[in-house]
Amino acid sequence: MAILSSQKQPLEPEPSKNPQSVQQPGLPPSTPEQGLLTAEVSPEERLSRTDDIRPQRLADYVGQKELKEVLQIAIQAAQSRREPLDHLLLYGPPGLGKTTISLILAAEMGVSCKVTSAPALERPRDIVGLLVNLKPGDVLFIDEIHRLARMTEELLYPAMEDFRLDITIGKGQSARTRSLPLPPFTLVGATTRVGSLTSPLRDRFGLIQRLRFYEPEELSQIILRTASLLKTELTPSAALEIARRSRGTPRIANRLLKRVRDFAEVKAAGTITETIASEALQLFNVDPCGLDWTDRRLLTVMIEHYGGGPVGLETIAAATGEEAQTIEEVYEPYLLQIGYLNRTPRGRVATLAAWKHLGYTPPDGQLSLL
């Protein structure tokens, strides 16, 4: 989300008129690997089965230590009272395991989990069909819950609070409301935009938990486990090499592992060493900091054309040919996380770390902005 200021905004800074003031190593020509480092589910992943590599129990789930402790207490308390779990809202960047957690909760409670997403619930009857078919204690997982239609969301209010479905029959003065009892269930909502949820919906969740990015050591454990399930030989140092470039995201880590596995099977008789992993990821344009071709291009344009910034989002979008929303939602979060980009009231600024990573030397006048 762009940072706004109540003060009058200055005009966009003009492109640097003194290109000699920046030492320019340039961006090597390359064809970016489309979608390899995005945390969104790829079409290939939608078609393939991922259940085989998902952890089935909370004890097998790597990372998110505080979240696991909270959920373990909630599970044990619910089991002792023979009640369903409280409704749970999970928020955070995509690819961190929200769907996996909902499936684990259902497995721990010994119930079924129904998985859907808000865009699939276009009409009120879609959510009604799901709710009336739930069994006592079942888990209903709704991904991208911030995108629920208004009428669908309003149907969830009594369902979540009183396990009741209120259906309006007829129109105008002849309209009447009929209430249908629902079995007690647990709603698990997932969102990347918790601020976009309405207060009435957010307030009906008994547990609200944030998922954080993973440390390289945690991702390394996930990669080693996945490699074992895929019957792939992988050294611990190779797993850590892949983990460092995975943007703190398990989905990306598993995706990179599969691409490295393909490379190793063709080029190195199937065994993945640190050297093989590094060569494969270099081929796929994933650098040691987890930046891909597009990430580096965004920073390079800011540095070469605008002296590192500040520069507006729309200007960056026009200069790179990317949509402003794509830059803001897909590329910027990781650049902000690793400290390569700053958002200021005047625009985006490439940090000193970004200059050094790309091999540039900032001019003296720019150091005050970094």
Curated annotation (Swiss-Prot):
Localization annotation: Cytoplasm
One GO cellular component term noted in the UniProt record for this chain: Holliday junction resolvase complex
Binding site for Mg(2+): T99
Keyword match Protein transport: no
Residue ranges, compositional bias (Basic and acidic residues): 43-53
Task performed by this protein: The RuvA-RuvB-RuvC complex processes Holliday junction (HJ) DNA during genetic recombination and DNA repair, while the RuvA-RuvB complex plays an important role in the rescue of blocked DNA replication forks via replication fork reversal (RFR). RuvA specifically binds to HJ cruciform DNA, conferring on it an open structure. The RuvB hexamer acts as an ATP-dependent pump, pulling dsDNA into and through the RuvAB complex. RuvB forms 2 homohexamers on either side of HJ DNA bound by 1 or 2 RuvA tetramers; 4 subunits per hexamer contact DNA at a time.
This protein's name: Holliday junction branch migration complex subunit RuvB
Originating species: Cyanothece sp. (strain PCC 7425 / ATCC 29141)
Gene giving rise to this polypeptide: ruvB
